[in-house]
Amino acid sequence: MVQSEEKEPLERYDGLKAFCNEYGFEHSYLSGTEKRERHSGDLFIVVKDRDLVDLLKQATLQQLTPGLDFGIISYNDTPLKELLAGGITTLSTDFKLMGQTMSKLIEAKGICAVANPWKLNTRKSL
């Protein structure tokens, strides 16, 4: 997982670590990709778009193709990610439903923890 901002929740990596341990995948936490060599079969889970751009630039310089030489999953889908490098796989929450839920909680003056669904949009980068 690539996560360069200190203000991002580290619990995100805890969940990934638990998943990898359960299924026998190697994992590491990276604060950036600039000094990280890519190996066949590597998968980068990228939180910030800036890190995604850096990863794609480095791949171009090393003549590597996302989805063939290594994989990328990026957080939060955007129309641009549908086009970059033939399509970037994304993991994204349902922002519309999140807004509707928040609106209802505000109207009801309610406070509670809510599990919002996530979706994996599989594209060429994976």
Where are these regions (language model features)?
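Bacterial carbohydrate/catabolite-sensing allosteric modules
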Residues: 1-126
